[in-house]
Amino acid sequence: MHIRRSNQRGYADHGWLRSFHTFSFANYMDPNHMGFRALRVINEDRVAPGHGFGAHSHQDMEIISYVLEGEMEHRDNMGNGEVMRPGDVQRMSAGTGVLHSEFNHSNENGLHFLQIWIEPAKRGITPSYEQKAFPTAERQGQWRLVASQDGREGSVSVNQDVNLYAGLFDAGEQAAAPPSRYAWLHVVKGTIDVNGETLGSGDAAAFQPGETFSITGGQAAEVLLFDLA
């Protein structure tokens, strides 16, 4: 198990946007943290009321958004216009190219969300978009599959051999990790104990094939687990 602490991440403050970068991104460059397997980006973003990312383009990337607090408004040139709220998972396959914008839907409250980039298995595909809601009850005290290559169990589909799980753990709740190959565990908020180590908000742990782990002692914790080929 290799732990990457929250305070080891890159950070950028643009006034309207405060962003932590788990892996190298924009002006933050660390050759030792360019990604993990197909997982390329985990950015924890806080966006001021009424602000956001204007129209910009992407190609050949699987982009997943996960809202923690507030409301995020998404628009793209495929004709999609949606508002995301906590518990929602959005997947956009950029493929041959997509133009989109993401804004804080509120003029009063902040927006806190994760943007995740995953390298695609196939390049040059037709761009597509998908958004689904995952109620608290489906994630409380257990792992809920929210993204997968085949879209099974009601998850959003991703153009890569990856399984993404979300879980909520409180009052000492615990859970064994689902079967995984390479695994990246990211604590979104709260605290958990993993193999005797306490991980807090923004902390992460990487596991190699054959390494086993379980979560214990969850306290108001929200956790994402990536199972990667």
Regions of interest found by a model, annotated:
Residues M1-A229:
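Jelly-roll (double-stranded beta-helix
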